[in-house]
């Protein structure tokens, strides 16, 4: 085996390790490389933010809401605008249950080839579909990928651009045990968890959710929305800037 091939295999192994294990040591690097994105919110309070992407879904979103209610937990739902227009009753139910709605763009697809005008228009269409009122506004790009200029445009529209620090890649349908393990090992004050309720079949995510919530409780952590975590934070989102938590 040549040194070049060994180097390629080593890099591939490292990439797979980072992708599937998500060591916390990678976070500071990501934060320095992408300062327009928030991955976690520093806080001394025992709080973790839970978020769900790609809804609302007429079958799976209600199941997630029922589990959250049973565990007295709250979350931020990053909703796709065109799906919100198809299911306004679910948007209303999410809000009525005390959860937070946030902008996940109008369609579910890559943003990389969208013009600035199209990006701004779809961002505003989704905001109108969700009825986002005054207060902190959060945007998560589809697939977690956007050009720097698009992130700056979102910020110019008053949005904080949010990713996360515990993501089990549930759209790839990994085992329930992996979803539970990956999220649970990364549950620390200030963690932002990314899960999906709007993918084709999030059954494993829904099965893992009660276990994740129970693990957080055993760690003495309370599950809240991103806005609530920001209000208790030291830094990260603008709403945390005046916090006395640190």
Q: For the regions a protein language model found, what residue spans apply to each?
A:
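Short histidine/acidic/glycine/proline-rich micro-motifs that form metal-
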Residues: 79-84, 107-110, 145, 167-170, ...
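C-terminal domain-boundary segment and adjacent tail
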Residues: 24, 28-44, 70-72, 203-246
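Active-site beta->alpha N-cap acidic-glycine motif
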Residues: 22-112, 118, 124-125, 129, ...
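His/Asp/Glu-enriched short active-site or ligand-binding loop at hydrolase and phosphoryl-transfer sites
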Residues: 145-147, 151-186, 220-232
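N-terminal Sec-pathway targeting helices
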Residues: 1-12
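Charged helix-capping and loop-helix junction motifs
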Residues: 116-123, 175-181, 206-211
């Amino acid at each position: 085996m040549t040194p070049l091939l060994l180097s390629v295999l080593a890099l591939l192994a490292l990439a797979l390790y980072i992708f599937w294990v998500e060591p916390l040591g990678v976070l500071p690097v990501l934060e320095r490389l992408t300062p327009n994105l928030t991955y976690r919110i520093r806080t001394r309070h025992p709080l973790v933010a839970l978020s769900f992407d790609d809804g609302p879904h007429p079958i799976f979103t209600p199941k997630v809401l029922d589990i959250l209610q049973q565990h007295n937990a709250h979350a931020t739902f990053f909703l796709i605008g065109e799906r919100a227009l198809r299911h306004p009753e679910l948007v209303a139910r999410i809000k009525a249950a005390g959860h937070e709605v946030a902008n996940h763009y109008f369609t579910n697809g890559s943003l990389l080839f969208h013009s600035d005008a199209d990006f701004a228009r779809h961002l505003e269409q989704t905001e109108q579909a969700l009825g986002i009122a005054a207060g902190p506004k959060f945007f998560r790009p589809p697939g977690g990928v956007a050009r720097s200029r698009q992130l700056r445009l979102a910020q110019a529209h008053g949005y904080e651009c949010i990713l996360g620090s515990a993501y089990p890649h549930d759209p790839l349908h990994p085992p329930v045990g992996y979803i539970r393990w990956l999220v649970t090992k990364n549950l620390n004050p200030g963690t932002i968890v990314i899960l999906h309720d709007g993918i084709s079949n999030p059954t494993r995510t829904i099965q893992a959710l009660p276990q994740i919530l129970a693990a957080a409780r055993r760690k003495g952590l309370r599950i809240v929305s991103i806005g609530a975590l920001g209000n208790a934070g030291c830094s990260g989102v603008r709403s945390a800037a005046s916090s006395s938590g640190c």
